[in-house]
């Protein structure tokens, strides 16, 4: 049995793993796990012009809970070995498939810089960027109530602070976070920052240094692959017209509200 990756490309960590594996020509079977089942999402958005929809294995809406004891994605299954958590999966793939050194450098100082960003990321960029989608799409979808503009403003202020720190502390005047080549740090950062873009919060506008960094990341992984991986998130607003099963709505509404706090 070969490598299997259980992913939903609505998820930022899943997108980073998908892009990393494809960019490095790692052979794997894409097991599409739908965090919001087909009955919720309805028909998925058509592929963007020039982008081929990712090839997937059978939908795993029934069995995904059996794959990971944590019952969440992403999950890697390599024979009888199962691994969860984005960073752990990225590092496993980089080591097993001996990917180019720039992704996770052998140089101890450069590797430490990647580790530093990955540690900082969770309490800063990841703590703010996803909330834009919860406020603008998911909470209204599951509660039937739009969130007050003050909520979004509060989140955007927190995100702006994180972006300022990102530019000044990590990006500085470099092409990428650790220097002249892309690393896992850049990949983990960019997929997170595309989340607000998908709901109409263009955080790259009026930030030329950040915009240029994004352009370089897109070119490093390939623009076609980049937009293929982000197709679903860039069409996330289409969810607003979906009819939600009342039981699912009752279950998820308080969960989302709790995550926003």
Curated annotation (Swiss-Prot):
Domain GST C-terminal span(s) in chain numbering: 107-248
PROSITE patterns membership: GST_CTER, GST_NTER
Catalytic activity: RX + glutathione = an S-substituted glutathione + a halide anion + H(+)
Localization annotation: Cytoplasm
UniProt KW keywords: Cytoplasm, Transferase
Keyword Cytoplasm: yes
Single GO MF descriptor: glutathione transferase activity
GO biological processes: glutathione metabolic process
Top-rank taxon, per record: Eukaryota
InterPro entries assigned to the protein according to its UniProt record, in alphabetical order: Glutathione-S-Trfase_C-like, Glutathione-S-Trfase_C_sf, Glutathione_S-Trfase, Glutathione_S-Trfase_N, GST_C, GST_C_Theta, GST_N_Theta, GST_Theta
UniProt-listed Enzyme Commission number(s): 2.5.1.18
Enzyme superclass (EC): transferase
Example of a GO cellular component annotation carried by this entry: cytoplasm
Residue ranges annotated for the GST N-terminal domain, each copy included: 2-101
Pfam families in alphabetical order: GST_C (PF00043)
Binding site for glutathione: 72-73, 85-86
Keyword DNA-binding in annotation: no
Self-association and partners: Homodimer.
Known function: Conjugation of reduced glutathione to a wide number of exogenous and endogenous hydrophobic electrophiles.
Family that this chain belongs to: Belongs to the GST superfamily. Theta family.
Protein name: Glutathione S-transferase theta-1
Species: Gallus gallus
Taxonomic lineage from the root: Eukaryota, Metazoa, Chordata, Craniata, Vertebrata
Gene: GSTT1
């Amino acid at each position: 049995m070969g490598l299997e990756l259980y992913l939903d490309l609505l998820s930022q960590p899943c997108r980073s793993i998908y892009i990393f594996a494809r960019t490095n020509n790692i052979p794997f079977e894409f097991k599409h796990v739908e965090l919001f089942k087909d009955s919720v999402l309805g028909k998925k958005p058509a592929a963007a012009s020039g982008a081929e929809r990712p090839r997937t294995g059978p939908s795993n809406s029934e069995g995904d809970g059996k794959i990971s004891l944590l019952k969440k994605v992403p999950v890697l299954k390599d024979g009888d070995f199962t691994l969860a958590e984005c960073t752990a999966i990225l590092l496993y793939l980089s080591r097993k498939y001996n990917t180019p050194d720039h992704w996770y450098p052998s140089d101890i100082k450069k590797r430490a810089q990647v580790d530093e960003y990955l540690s900082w990321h969770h309490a800063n960029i990841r703590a703010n960027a996803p909330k834009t989608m919860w406020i603008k799409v998911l909470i209204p979808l599951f509660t039937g109530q739009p969130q007050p503009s003050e909520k979004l403003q509060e989140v955007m202020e927190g995100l702006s602070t994180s972006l300022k720190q990102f530019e000044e502390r990590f990006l500085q005047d470099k092409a990428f976070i650790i220097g002249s080549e892309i690393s896992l740090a850049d990949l983990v950062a960019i997929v997170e920052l595309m989340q607000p873009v998908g709901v109409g919060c263009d955080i790259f506008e009026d930030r030329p240094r950040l915009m240029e960094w994004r352009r370089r990341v897109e070119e490093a992984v390939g623009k076609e692959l980049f937009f293929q991986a982000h197709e679903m998130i860039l069409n996330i607003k289409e969810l607003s017209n979906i009819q939600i099963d009342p039981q699912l709505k009752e279950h998820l509404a308080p969960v989302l509200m709790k995550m926003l706090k």
